[in-house]
């Protein structure tokens, strides 16, 4: 029988990022921010704090399950901060697939920038429950606060940590400035 914690495997990501950083102008915090319009490559790791998830609702049938929950993802590296993650998890038991969608807000820094807040309502994580393969895409594009920046990240699951929380690696790019 499938345990309910499997849906979160697709959610989890702790990010360690490396970036090619341009010389930038000081931000209001006094930290350097890569030059406006400059795109930097990023990569790293992350962890989904599944053990502290708040489950809001869960509906199940013999062939599928839908769960709505709120989780926190910790990021370190070039993206250093946290993600508040409100997720809808859909599990298709027949096809052995899990899909996560919903809303998330990132609060932290990017490549040493001043703090930013970015929203994403287009992310999608998939898990093949037969093989364990996990992957997803994140679109941190809706600016809320701080320097203007947009990031697109591809994530790949790396399994649970010692506490049972899902982990992942990611690669992508962030563009400073713009709309």
Question: For each predicted feature, which ranges?
Answer:
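Positively charged n-region of N-terminal signal peptides that target proteins for export
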Residues: 1-4
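Boundary at the C-terminal end of the N-terminal hydrophobic targeting segment
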Residues: 19-24
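Beta-strand-enriched cores of mature, soluble protein domains
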Residues: 25-179
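Bacterial N-terminal signal peptides
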Residues: 7-18
């Amino acid at each position: 029988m499938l345990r309910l914690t499997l849906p979160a495997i697709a959610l989890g990501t702790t990010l360690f990022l490396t970036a090619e950083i341009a010389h930038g102008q000081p931000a209001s915090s006094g930290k350097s921010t890569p030059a406006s319009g400059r795109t930097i490559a990023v990569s790293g790791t992350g962890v989904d704090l599944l053990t502290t998830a708040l489950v809001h609702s869960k509906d199940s049938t013999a062939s599928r399950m839908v769960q709505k929950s709120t989780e926190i993802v910790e990021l370190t590296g070039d993206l250093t901060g946290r993600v508040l993650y409100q997720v809808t998890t859909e599990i298709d038991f027949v096809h052995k697939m899990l899909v996560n969608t919903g809303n998330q807000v990132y609060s932290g820094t990017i490549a040493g920038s001043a703090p930013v807040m970015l929203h994403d309502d287009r992310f999608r994580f998939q898990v093949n429950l037969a093989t364990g393969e996990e992957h997803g895409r994140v679109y941190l594009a809706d600016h809320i606060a701080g320097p203007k920046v947009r990031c697109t990240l591809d994530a790949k699951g790396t399994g649970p940590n010692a506490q049972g929380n899902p982990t992942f690696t990611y690669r992508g790019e962030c563009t400073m400035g713009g709309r």
